[in-house]
Regions:
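Short, surface-exposed beta-edge/turn micro-motifs
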Residues: 7, 21, 51-54, 77-79
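Acidic, aromatic-enriched beta-alpha/helix-loop junctions
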Residues: 28-73
């Protein structure tokens, strides 16, 4: 069975006072390697999703730099960014820590 390639993993999120995502802690795939953690603003995350990049929530496994424990996909529904299976208004990345 072929593994689906991921383009990015969101490890943590910070919400602005209005409930929208302010920025996320993000790992980006570069070929067979992954970036260090970067802080990605909401507009840049929305652009990644608009380009069709496959982004999921997850966390990097300790001492194994290129292995992640992954969760649901992150989708953009209209103006909202949410994890797969979520509904409602506003941004909602369920199951990842807030920092």
């Amino acid at each position: 069975m072929a593994r689906n390639k991921l383009d990015g993993v969101i490890e943590a999120v910070r919400y602005a006072p209005g409930g929208k995502i302010d920025f996320v802690r993000f790992y980006e795939r570069h070929g067979v390697v992954w970036s260090d953690a970067i802080l990605l603003e909401r507009k840049d995350l929305a652009e990644q999703l608009k380009l069709g990049k496959r982004v999921v929530v997850g966390k990097r496994r300790a001492n194994i730099g290129s292995v992640f424990e992954t969760g649901p996909a992150v989708l953009q529904k209209e103006a909202n960014i949410m994890t797969e299976g979520q509904s409602g208004n506003g941004d909602n990345l369920d199951g990842i820590p807030v920092f």
